[in-house]
Amino acid sequence: MKISMRIVGVSAIALALCGCGGSEKKAAEYSPKGADGAALAVGFNQKQIKAVQERLLGEKAKEVSSSLMKNAPEEVSDVIKKAGLEDAEVRWGVVTVGEPKLKEDMDLDGVPEVMVAVSLDIDIEKVVAAFREQLKKEAGEELKETTVAGVKAWIASDKDLEKQKVSPTFTALDGKLFLAASTTASLEKLVALYRDGKGQSAAFSSFGLPADLLLRLVLTDIGARVKKSIPKPEETLKIVSQFVPNGDKMILALGALDFSATSAKDGGVALKLTLKTGSEKDADQLRTLAKTGLMPFTAQMKEAAKEDAESKVYAELLEALKIAGTEGVFEANLAVPQAVLKSLAENQLK
């Protein structure tokens, strides 16, 4: 049985995320800063901004961009002062959301995808505490409406996706605060829209989003959905008890299951699954079952790795998986390097 980490059919993937900063010459580009920084980001990358400006009315688009750049500092400073965060380093840029089908005769009043994005280098806890309500009051609804409009325009190119629901949300991820838009369409379907003529994916460059960050989004989404979709104890008790002694106690403890995906110092991601079983005996038994159960899969993947590069990656991940925990708590930890994340992302898109 081959273990595959390819992610298919995952819904509610957050879109419209990219970092921002720079000056009038250099608009939004995302750059991970680690857990000690924070960013409010809406928009896409520099190439898309230039493309939209060119497709709009040339000089008029530049005039609007210059106006936004000129006025942004004062507006941002005002919000900073109201939030009591005068020491925050602020950068801004003109960005676009989505890839709307623009007609040559369309004026800027009909294009809500041009806006100002702001990057704040401050502690995420301060951002969440001081800015969340402020953002909702000052610009929340406007940004949400614009983001949704951009995403809807983007998915309108596919009849199936056109029917999918789109909803905006404020999201804290990897030490950053984002305004995101999510859709019920599958990751596979979304990625398919961004394949170029040679079958190679342009998804990450089009998103302006690093592969490792996209994978963290997906993994976090999976963890949340696994936790939410755990069956009620009475529905699965009989099945579990056939394989695990004292399974009734363990299944009742599944409500304490927690999954997290956080940024690692090397640019990778640290995955952690924690389950409070209620007793050290049950936790120890679960650790034993996990370790012995993984052994044959690891051996099989090692064998397959001799001829398959993808299997080699999975074999290394299985070996890196650490089963731990004490005092009635079961833990499974996996540190995935940045290079492996990118490799997995590339395999997902083939």
Predicted regions and their residues:
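Bacterial N-terminal signal peptides that target proteins for export
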Residues: 1-9
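C-terminal motif of bacterial Sec signal peptides marking the signal peptidase cleavage site
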Residues: 16-19
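Long, low-complexity, Ser/Thr/Gly/Pro-rich intrinsically disordered segments that act as flexible linkers
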Residues: 23-150, 263, 329
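One face of beta-strands
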Residues: 38-42, 114-120, 215, 253-261, ...
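A cross-kingdom marker for long, charged
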Residues: 39, 264-267, 283, 304-350
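Solvent-exposed coil/turn segments that connect beta secondary-structure elements
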Residues: 47, 100, 119-123, 159, ...
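An internal, short helix-loop-strand segment that often contains or flanks glycine-aspartate motifs
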Residues: 49, 57-89, 93-94, 137-266, ...
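Short, conserved charged micro-motifs
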Residues: 51, 122-129, 280-288, 341
